[in-house]
Amino acid sequence: MAQEILVLGAGMVGTCTALELRLRGHSVTLLDRRAPGQETSYGNAGVIQREAVEPYAMPRDWAALLAVALKRGLDVNYHLSGLLAAWPQLLRYWRASAPARHRLIGRQYAGLIAHCTSEHERLMELAGAQDLLRRDGLRLIYRSERALDAALAHAGRLTQEHGIRFAALDGRALAAAEPAFRLPLAGAVHWLESCNVSDPGELVERYAALFRQRGGRLLLGDANSLRPAGAGWQAESREGPVQAQQVVLALGPWAGDFARRLGYRWPLFVKRGYHRHYRGGATLNTTTLDAERGYVLAPQRRGLRITSGAEIARLDAPPTPRQLLGAETEARQLLELGEAVEAQPWLGSRPCSADMKPLIGAAPRHPGLWINCGHGHQGFTLGPASARLLADLIEGGTPYTEAEAFAPLRFGR
């Protein structure tokens, strides 16, 4: 039975949710303060990470934690104010990263990740967006033999447990695959089933265009205006009030504050990240993670995009692009980088949950309120797959993959 549904948030997750529901015949309005794909979804590395069957765990060894505390590497940075504000969530993150618990979380997470590529491909075909997709995998490069050996052992375990494919490259094979690299490297793990998108923001725009073509409404407005109205909900747009029977909260890094106003204390926190494009340098054939340095090099339409590691900071804290500047220094040693396109780095935020799994399902105390947020590093990857899962739940049918593990109710009422 068709319903009136309002989706708050036009990033990858929200746009895919609105599109999936509209494709199923529901009357759907997508509301955001900006055009689709202009916030978090614009700024990632553009990788659909089929290999990400286990979410990123917090380091458990004290040497790694000390390196983070002393800011010795580029993979993690923090503001003290942000660290203190997120301390309860980070403690829960630490506990969830214990090996046995993380292995269980990984098995649950893998059930959703398994559909990430096929679900994107389904929507890309409908949206005519195949020109943005490259099926060339994700390459993780290593500078030391010790790190490479550990990575190969880890990749072998993931292949055995989840069936995902990879290729092992020694230093000579890596040099042949990427002639632009001018440093001797130990080798690489090349995940073969991951895909790359040459313009992440453009892909969200294509999905939004398909949503409109199929009869969906896209409006500019303030999600904070949402309030109960009769048997449903109402929010304010620039064109006037919008009413719906059901509402989906897909506000990315802003979801935690919004949920707290409704009385929910879900353990959500923010990891910020930076990027910048470079042109006029060497050609890189495949998106590459410099694994021992903590940054990504992604060939994209605007140039070679460098994306930074994670920064624990308040959502509205001033930019501190230490990681990106350090990544640029490392990248210039690795290959001819060219000149920066933007005068200042881009800054965005990832919405993370303490147990590393997204929240997908019904809000426990508010009938008609649905949640699709907290995807961490994988909102871009999981947008279509989590949209399909939530649509199954809204319609009351049998979910196409496990749903209970992602229910907001796991954090209590």
Role assignments for model-derived ranges:
Residues 3-30:
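N-terminal Rossmann-like FAD-binding beta1-loop-alpha1 element of flavoenzymes
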Residues 23-43:
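Glycine-rich FAD pyrophosphate-binding loop
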Residues 47, 52, 56-95, 225-228, ...:
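Active-site substrate-recognition segment that forms the wall
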Residues 87-209:
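Rossmann-like flavin
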